[in-house]
Regions:
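ATP-binding glycine-rich loop module of kinase domains
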Residues: 14-72, 103-104
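Catalytic phosphate/metal-binding cores of nucleic-acid and nucleotide-processing enzymes, i.e., regions
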Residues: 24, 39, 120, 137-140, ...
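Conserved alphaE helix
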Residues: 108-126
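C-lobe/activation-segment region of protein kinase-like
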Residues: 144-207
Length: 207
């Protein structure tokens, strides 16, 4: 679907500042209950991947808990971004920083729940041959006991892949991302803590 708006409309959008729905290649704003991302389409990395085509293909798919594009946005017939479901909650990076600062506790069970929640979503995405490409704490939002995927600029549909191939690629991306999270945020200070985290990692890679 397509949404045509004016530059005046963009100038009057309210920025999202709660730590969620932020990306490296654009800014996100509130838009009638959804989020709208205005992409810097002139950046070289954006030009190279034909992001408009990617987002158009992804907009045909709906997955619960994944902020896939709803409509592509144009100003004066020029592609500038897309709308997506808005989740009003902090991202995982904010949560992990609070953990590291000692402001909240996170157990191995919490870690496993996060992994399982994301795994369930990439399983459905894999059915539609969507490769996630960009999983990191900035792009994961925790809301109502569930972990949501946002900022899907670099997702791509690859119809040449089977479901199994898509799932394999997505699990590799997910496992790599979560291993980085463990290494960065969980500096285990005791043998007991280290054993808990290593047990979590073993559980993840058995999937």
């Amino acid at each position: 679907m397509r949404l045509d708006i004016s530059s005046y409309d963009i100038d009057n959008l309210k920025p999202i500042t709660n730590g969620g729905h932020r990306g490296n290649f654009g800014a996100c704003y509130l838009f009638y209950g959804d989020a709208i991302k205005i992409i810097d389409v002139d950046k070289d990395v954006i030009k190279k991947i034909d992001i408009e085509k990617r987002l158009e293909e992804a907009s045909k798919v709906k997955v619960e808990g994944v902020s896939l594009p709803k409509m592509l946005v144009y100003v004066n017939n020029k592609f500038i971004g897309y709308t997506m479901p808005y989740y009003n909650a902090p991202n995982l990076k904010v949560i992990l920083m609070k953990y590291k600062q000692g402001k909240l506790s996170i157990t191995s069970n919490d870690i496993n729940n996060a992994y399982t929640s994301i795994l369930n979503k990439i399983d459905v995405l894999s059915y539609y041959k969507i490769i996630v490409n960009d999983i990191k704490p900035d792009n994961i939002i925790y809301l109502d006991g569930d972990f949501k995927l946002v900022d899907c600029d670099f997702y791509r549909v690859d119809t040449s892949l089977t479901y199994s191939d898509s799932l394999k690629k997505n699990k590799e991306i997910l496992n790599h991302a979560y291993k980085k999270i463990i290494n960065k945020y969980f500096e285990c200070k005791t043998y007991k803590d280290n054993d808990i985290i290593n047990t979590s990692l073993r559980m993840w890679f058995l999937w």
